[in-house]
Amino acid sequence: SYAFIRQNISADLLFNGNNKSNTQDFDHYLRRLGYKFKNESKDCGGYIVLKNKKICLAMDTGSSPNPKYTQDYQSGALSFEIISNGKKLITNCGYYKKNNQNLNEISKSSAAHSTLIIDDNSSCKFIKSKDKLILKTGLKITQKNSVFEKNYWKINAAHDGYLKKFKSIHERNIEFFPEQM
C-alpha cells in the first residue's frame, strides 16, 4: 500500500486517520538499499486512485473496518481528493489525534470530509470507549467501479450508511476529462 499511495502520488491523502507526514528519510532509505516498488493497480485497500503526470483523483471506496480497528477511522466514505500539479484542489480535513475530544469527534464526522451528510447525520455512528471514539454503526460499500482511459476517467461507488435511518443509498459518480485541463 505504500507504493500504491505514497510513491505513486507523492502527497498525503487525508483519509481515515492519515495526516501530513514526512517520509523523506524512509524514501531515501528505500532508494539507498535499491528497493523499487511498482504498482499499476488503480484500486487497493479501499481506495481508487486515478492519475496522470498533472492530475490525481482519489476516492475512499472502502467499507467500514471492524470496530476494534476504528479509533482513527473517519466516516468519510466516498469522499475524494483532487491534486493538480502537486497542489491540493479538494481535500479532507485529516484526523486530529491529540487529546481534544471535541476536535477528535469533529474530524471523524462526515461533515469534515468531501462527502454527503443528511440532516446533520454522518454515515457512521461512534461511541466513546475508554476515552476513545470507536465505531458503533458502520457502512458497507454496495458497488464500485472505475474507468481510466487517456481522455476519460470515472469513479462510481455507493454505500449503505444512510439506508437504515433515511432509506437511502448514497451513490457518487465523478467523471473527469483530462485533456480539457
Spans of model-derived segments:
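Carbohydrate-active enzyme catalytic cores, enriched for enzymes
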Residues: 1-91, 95
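Alpha-helix initiation/capping motif
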Residues: 22, 94, 121, 177-178
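Residues embedded in well-ordered secondary-structure elements
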Residues: 39, 69-71, 75, 105, ...
